[in-house]
Amino acid sequence: MPVPGTTFLRHFRDAYVDALGEARIQQSYGFRSYERFGIVGAASTDAPVVPTSAVAGLQTMVTRLDDRGREVGLGERVPLADALRAYTVNGAYASFEEGIKGTLATGMLGDVTVFETDLFAVDPDDLAQVKVDLTVSGGEVVHAR
């Protein structure tokens, strides 16, 4: 099951072009292709290699633009709902924990992140700027702004 660091293309586009060529990076981290072929893909970050910003990862998945606004395989863009699922439901599935986390439901751990605004109301190009107001993990507040 692929679990790519979704911001690699955002931060390292030029290195990928140098190593793989322009044509091959267009398909890299191809969540749209995963879906088309019935592959479940989970999204991740890879600290300290890249910042641990899931919202930057969401932005990259939805826009397929690097940090300079250059396109990286627009055909691999996914809707925001699919990108969120890759970080939540599919992330739990990847770690064999789908029975205890990944969704908000009775009997689940109830891990949750609260953003300062409705992500679906934000321009996709601005997702990386959205702040996290609160994070609850294992019933404990682990981040509060």
Language-model features: where?
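His/Asp/Glu-enriched, well-ordered alpha-helical/loop segment
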Residues: 1-121, 125, 130-138
